[in-house]
Each structure stands twice: as structure tokens, then as C-alpha cells.
Amino acid sequence: MVLNFRDKSCIFLAILCCLSLSCIVKASVSYDRKAVIINGQRRILLSGSIHYPRSTPEMWPGLIQKAKEGGLDVIETYVFWNGHEPSPGQYYFGDRYDLVKFIKLVHQAGLYVNLRIGPYVCAEWNFGGFPVWLKFVPGMAFRTDNEPFKAAMKKFTEKIVWMMKAEKLFQTQGGPIILAQIENEYGPVEWEIGAPGKAYTKWVAQMALGLSTGVPWIMCKQEDAPGPIIDTCNGYYCEDFKPNSINKPKMWTENWTGWYTDFGGAVPYRPVEDIAYSVARFIQKGGSLVNYYMYHGGTNFDRTAGEFMASSYDYDAPLDEYGLPREPKYSHLKALHKAIKLSEPALLSADATVTSLGAKQEAYVFWSKSSCAAFLSNKDENSAARVLFRGFPYDLPPWSVSILPDCKTEVYNTAKVNAPSVHRNMVPTGTKFSWGSFNEATPTANEAGTFARNGLVEQISMTWDKSDYFWYITDITIGSGETFLKTGDSPLLTVMSAGHALHVFVNGQLSGTAYGGLDHPKLTFSQKIKLHAGVNKIALLSVAVGLPNVGTHFEQWNKGVLGPVTLKGVNSGTWDMSKWKWSYKIGVKGEALSLHTNTESSGVRWTQGSFVAKKQPLTWYKSTFATPAGNEPLALDMNTMGKGQVWINGRNIGRHWPAYKAQGSCGRCNYAGTFDAKKCLSNCGEASQRWYHVPRSWLKSQNLIVVFEELGGDPNGISLVKRT
């Protein structure tokens, strides 16, 4: 048959149409009761959380590649509002906050993205990711049916979605984003506040759906997630979780691979056998997406850590704080992922047939026309079991699952760890520091930069969280006839504070310190102080250690000295100083002088050599050092210091607080049995955090290190180490 030009043109157009339709089909994300469907295909999705601001852009490619090599399909991240909009309408998407770059790197690696926009994140992040300025918007009430909050939240959410669309990053545009999350763990808050919470849930769902991303929206810990939005599970175990509709897939957005470290707390860890067991149990009971929170935890640089959170956000993740594989956790989970993928055709084609193999043992068998997979489970915490399945014996350790991708061959058991353990060491680099020091004087009531008020003021309303530090200053005049001057029985100063730490200076000398903790952020300082006849200078340095990241009514949270403040033991009994006239000052002097940078004020004289201050409060230290050879990750050993902050070449590597020793019960930990954050602990009696990550990408050939020490420490004990 001979085709004329018109026939050929019609065929060519038909082919183009088919190709176009094919592209449309391929660029699609939907779901059914079994799984997320990408490009028309159901998928078992293995995911890991990597938060872009908690590492450096130079680290991102390596982290993403290791995640891919570890068997992951998806990278999950929050979006950090306070990092992106530090002032109203002023946006920042550079350096560690270059969200677009991060997502494009994930795409280049061939992985997908679950973008948890929130924009509330919790995440042990300062103020839960909210910008502090939001607290002071008139009429503001957080995360409820409140117009000022909804307007701000909608504006930022739209900003992020439009940015993703402009860069063509949603899967329907050919990008990697296959899921997006609105809000975050809101169910408990909704339950607590009632009707306004329910109204807010409906509003936020409709707002998100109206943005037309082309990919499914999810809400975690949200049993009443409306309509097409998928409700998902967070926790150590989610095997028994069920979504609120039989038409939605069973998804796990946070499988906690460990837990956070707070100052004053021991360091938690979670045995990999238990993580693998939890994943296998979830998959055998119909789960189709598992996300490890965290896969790489990273570092809380700057002042981004939440209330009392350590600068390290290592989380006992498969990739440690420095980006190195944690073994055997990384490799044992990699083997799990391979076994699950071998079973994927059967898992997604059929529902499980469950058969008892013993009192606490059972088989989950998935049949399809072309495949069969079985999960053999032993729920017994104490005893191993030999079971018969299809006429063959299988040995199941306690609290374990064996995976048989062909219903015959055991390729993996969650408790049989074949990967070798690797112990990481912190090895001194031999770097020598030659310290200079500068001691701050305590401010006085009438000096420059102070302002006065009658009574006590709340700290964050004054600082707007631009500094951790806020001074409360007053004078106490003691008459010569006061009895305590003769008896030597000094009066008792009592200061009640909403947190987090308080340094009390009397006549320029540190009289004492008090601090709270994560479970009890409020504090009371109560100590006898030495006063003389005449005017005595009282300076209270109130210190915030991050802002709370979880709870309700963010707009009502307070910090600082709110009183009462009393002096007991004077002739007239007790003085209530709470309503006295107080002077206030935001920040410490060194911050105002930018001592952490190379552009410091020339008016500062640094003490050198043998005159360098040791064990003195309010002391700044600086030195220079050369970058060590090699490519091993670097850290500072700060074990001889007390509390403060550290800068490298003007960049803040986080708060240090080695003086706060870890409380808790450390000892042997059995993987078997239900895990919680207190079960497996290390570091008891030692500093909650000793080593502080120094990113190599922040270094030059010669570098400046600056330390601000609040309590007093010995800088000669600081050393630069490499992680090997």
C-alpha cells in the first residue's frame, strides 16, 4: 500500500499524540488502598529524612548518594519557615537554606522527594520553625481558626508551592516531588483545643488542595484528615495503624531511628534489630511507605536548636552527624531494603494470608499470579522459635521477622545482623591554639544601650530572639544600720524565672548560676549574696537556650525573669523587688562589637599569653589555626569549657554546654521488646555533648575561632579532632 502525504501526516500526528499521552501518563502521582502510584505503577517506597539546613550544601550530594546506595527511593524534608522568612516579607533561600538546590540534587540522584511544607515543623527546631516575629502580629493565635495566623501561614505555603512550580519540581511537571505535607502532627493539638482546631483542620486542608500541586497531600498524626488527604503515622511502631479510609494507603512518615539529645540528657540510641523489626512488621501488615526519621540528623548550627536541644542532631541515624555510615545500622537496613524490593511484586499484588506458626509466631503470605513472598514473624521478646513453613524449618530469633521473597528462601532476618560494627573515633589533629581573651564587664543601670521600665519585662518580647542574652539590672542600697552587716548573715536573694538559665552578678562578680531543663524549663535562683553598705549593683543575665518547638498557644509562651524577685534578711524583713525600677539591655557586649568576626571593633584589647583568662565568666576567646590535611570530618572537643557559643570564620557552629552533665540510667540494652526513648542510653554522667561539628567547607587555609564562655572554662583544653 502506498501512503500519500496526507496519510503520512495523519500517522505522524497520531504518533505525536500517543507520545504526548504517554508523557502525561508517566508524569502522574496518585494512590489507591495499597500504595502510592507513580506513573501508573504501585510502589513500595523507602524513604529517609535529611533536613537541608542541618548540613552544608557541600555535604548534600554525598548524603543523598549514600541514601540511594542504602536502598532509599525518597528523601523527606521539612521546610523551615523561620530560616526562609527571618523578617516579614523578606525571604532567604541561600546557602544551607537553598531548598531548590537541595531538591534538584535529589532529582539528579534519581530519587523522589516528600516535601513536608508544614509550615509548622516541630523537629526540635527553634520555635517549631515559626518565625519569632509571627508571635507579635496583633491578634495572633498559632495553629487554630485565627485569621492573622491563617493569612500568614497561607502566604508562606503559597510561596513555597509557587517556587516549586516555577522550578518544575513536582512530579507532574517532571520533577521529583511526589508527596507534599500540610501541617504537622496536628491531631493532638486539635483534640486539646476542640472546635477551633477542627475548623482549622478543614480550612488548612482545603487551602492545600486549592494549590493544585498535582501530587497527593498528606497529614501526619491526623485521624480526621479530610477528603483525599492521606493521614499517616509517626512513632517507633506503626504496624497496627490504619488510615481513615479504606481507599488510602498505609504510610509511615516518621520511624524514629533513635531520639534527640537535650542538654542535661543522656544520648539515646536504638538498636538496628528493633528498627528493622518495626519496618518488616509494618510492611507485612500492608504498609507501603516507610520513612526513617532521621536518616541523617546533622547539626543544629547557629541558634536553630529548640528548647534545651543540643547542637548535635545526630539522632543515632544510619548516617551520623558528620555524614558517615553508622555501622551496622546503615548496612543492616540496606539489606532489609533489598529484601523488601525483592518481595515488592507480591506485596503490591495481593493481600496477606495470615497463618499461625505458634503461640507468638505467624506467617504473612502474599500470592500473586507470578510471585509469592512470605514474612515469618516471631513476636516473643524472650525466646527464639523454630517454625515449620511449607514443610521447611526456619529459625526465628526473639522479636524478629524473616523475609522469604520466593516463599522459600530466607534472604533476611531482622535480628541476624551480618554487617560488621564500626567504632568511630575522635582523633586529635595536633592543631595548636594560641588564645587571646577579652572579659566583659557587667552592664550598669545607666550605661549606653540600656532602657528602663517599672517592674519586670518578658525576655522574648524585648529581644525578638535576636540574642540568647538579656540583662535585668538594678541597684540595692543598703543602710549602714542593717543587722546583717554586723552578723555576717548575708540576705537571701530569690529570683524566679521562666527559663532557661540565669547568671547572677553582684557588684560585678558572679554570685551564682541556676538553670532548668527540657522537662522543667522554669528555674529558681535562691542564694545568699554578699552586700555592703551603700549602693550594690545587681545584674541578672537571663539566657534563652532555644525556644519551645512543641505544644499549644505559641503566642503565650514566655521566657526570662518574670518574678517574683525578693531579698530576705534585711531589717524590715523581705523586700519584693519585682516592681522596682529595672534597667534592661539586649545581648552581651561582644555581640554588639561583632567579636565573632574578623571585622571586630578596634576598641577591644585582647589579653595574650600567660595573662589569658581562665575559669572566668563572660569571657571571649579567639585564636587562629590552619586547616588540617585530609578530608575526614572535623569537630571541636569542648569538654573543658562551661557554656556558650562557638564561631568558625564568623559562622556559628552552635551552642556548647559541656558543664551540663547527662542524667539517666545507662546500661546494657536488649534489642528485643518495645522500645522507647529512655530504654537505651549512653553518656550518663558525662557532658550531654562534648564534640561540635566544624564543617570543612567553612574553612580556609587560615581560620579564626571565637568562643564566648558564659560560666568559665579552660580554653587550653579545646582541641580540633577528626572523626575516623
UniProtKB/Swiss-Prot annotation:
Pfam families with a match to the protein in the record: BetaGal_gal-bd (PF21467), GHD (PF17834), Glyco_hydro_35 (PF01301)
Enzyme class: hydrolase
UniProt EC number: 3.2.1.23
Residues that carry a glycan: N255
Gene3D superfamilies membership: Galactose-binding domain-like, Glycosidases
UniProt KW Secreted keyword: yes
One GO molecular-function entry: beta-galactosidase activity
Main location: secreted
Induction comment from the UniProt entry of this chain: By sugar starvation and exposure to darkness for 24 hours.
Catalytic activity: Hydrolysis of terminal non-reducing beta-D-galactose residues in beta-D-galactosides
Organs and tissues of expression: Ubiquitous, with higher expression levels in roots and siliques.
Keywords assigned by UniProt, alphabetized: Apoplast, Glycoprotein, Glycosidase, Hydrolase, Secreted, Signal
Subcellular location: Secreted, Extracellular space, Apoplast
Gene Ontology CC, one term: apoplast
Active-site residues, record numbering mapped to chain: E185 (proton donor), E254 (nucleophile)
Signal peptide segment: 1-27
GO biological process terms on file: carbohydrate metabolic process
Keyword tRNA processing set for record: no
Role noted for this protein: Preferentially hydrolyzes para-nitrophenyl-beta-D-galactoside. Can hydrolyze para-nitrophenyl-beta-D-fucoside with 5 time less efficiency.
Stated family: Belongs to the glycosyl hydrolase 35 family.
Name the UniProt record assigns to this protein: Beta-galactosidase 4
Organism: Arabidopsis thaliana (Mouse-ear cress)
Gene: BGAL4
